[in-house]
């Protein structure tokens, strides 16, 4: 069982300080930048291939996935992980199966949050691969259940909740090297207060990677359309998680989640008390409720031809009254 104490931040820093070859490698690659659109496309293609293999009862090869994770981890450690990648994961629409996009989105979230947690390179890579493959067994759930628009009946819910065992079986079958992936996939729906499934585990009995991914998976699901419901805004999702789910998740991880994504993150749509609508273009750590905004709809509900910016730190009479989704804007 991997425990949270194994994800040692201090040990990570010591390792980087004393590993001259690693420091030299980072220095040589510091000018290399990750192309976010290309990486996202390749990650989706990899996941499509994995899910197709699993659907056909074949063993997937994880070599390409490990290389993809290495790329994004290196970018994170170099300090040039593109913010555009996070925006794509938060606000992009599913272009393929939602299982594919969800896996890639949660992976991106995990790398950003792992950076906040200051995980060492090896642990960050393990977290990334675990996030990418955490839902792999769900491809075996019948589509009439997985894509059902109405609420699931009890017997259908029972079928759905078997998929963590399928994920465990699939990943465990890849060998001892990937046991941590199998355990994480089995535990990702468990909750700190014992309210999760399939085993009703509590606290430290839950795999630490699964504890991180559990928060991010829920956030991703809430902020993207699903067959059963429309997505929430970032603000609504965060409020829901903090208000109703805080006992289900580790407090340290909820804090890291908020520090990673903020209250009004870049690119999110907000409505001011004046009635104007804008998009967040800059956040301020010291005043998270008062970001800089580019106005796109004026107070008379008319699209502006030339967007103007407002820094809410300098406009004390104005404040954010609501957070919106693209659907709200286009309604």
Residue ranges and their predicted role:
Residues 1-59, 66, 231-331:
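Terminal helices and disordered tails flanking the catalytic cores of nucleotide-processing hydrolases
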Residues 12, 150-151, 157, 197, ...:
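Short capping/connector residues at structural and topological boundaries
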Residues 20-161, 168, 172-175:
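Acidic/His-rich, divalent-metal-binding segments that scaffold phosphate/diphosphate chemistry
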Residues 49, 56, 61, 80, ...:
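Detector for Asparagine
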Residues 61, 65, 72, 87-91, ...:
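Residue-level signal for alpha-helical context at structural boundaries
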Residues 89-93, 147-155, 185, 205-209, ...:
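Short alpha-helical linear motifs
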Residues 106, 126-140, 158-169, 173-254, ...:
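Alpha-helical scaffolding flanking metal-ion-dependent phosphate/phosphodiester catalytic sites
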Residues 150-151, 210, 233, 295:
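Residue-level signature of transmembrane alpha-helix interfaces in integral membrane proteins
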């Amino acid at each position: 069982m991997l425990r949270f104490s194994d994800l040692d931040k201090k040990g990570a820093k010591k390792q980087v300080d004393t590993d001259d070859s690693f420091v030299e490698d980072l220095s040589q690659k510091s000018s290399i930048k990750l192309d976010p659109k290309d990486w996202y496309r390749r990650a989706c293609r990899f996941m499509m291939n994995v899910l197709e293999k699993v659907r056909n009862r074949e063993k997937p090869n994880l070599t390409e996935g490990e290389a993809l994770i290495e790329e994004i981890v290196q970018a994170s450690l170099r300090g040039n992980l593109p913010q555009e990648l996070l925006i794509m994961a938060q606000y992009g629409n599913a272009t393929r199966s939602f299982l594919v996009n969800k896996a890639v989105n949660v992976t991106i979230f995990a790398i950003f949050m792992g950076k906040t947690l200051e995980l060492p390179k090896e642990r960050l890579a393990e977290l990334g691969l675990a996030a990418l493959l955490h839902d792999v067994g769900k491809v075996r759930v019948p589509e009439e259940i997985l894509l059902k628009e109405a609420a699931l009946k009890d017997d259908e819910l029972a079928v759905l909740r078997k998929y963590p065992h399928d994920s465990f079986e699939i990943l465990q079958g890849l060998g001892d090297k990937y046991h941590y992936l199998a355990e994480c996939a089995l535990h990702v729906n468990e909750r700190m207060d014992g309210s999760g499934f399939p085993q009703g585990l509590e606290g430290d009995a839950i795999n630490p990677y699964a504890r991180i991914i559990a928060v991010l998976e829920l956030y991703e699901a809430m902020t993207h359309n699903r067959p059963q419901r429309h997505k929430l805004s970032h603000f609504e999702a965060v409020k829901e998680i903090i208000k109703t789910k805080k006992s289900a998740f580790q407090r340290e991880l909820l804090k890291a989640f908020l520090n990673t994504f903020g209250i009004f993150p870049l690119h999110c749509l907000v409505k001011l008390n004046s009635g104007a609508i804008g998009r967040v273009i800059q956040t301020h750590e010291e005043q998270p409720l008062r970001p800089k905004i580019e106005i796109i709809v004026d107070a008379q509900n008319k699209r502006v031809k030339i967007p103007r910016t407002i820094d809410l730190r300098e406009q004390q009479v104005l404040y954010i009254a609501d957070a919106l989704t693209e659907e709200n804007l286009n309604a």
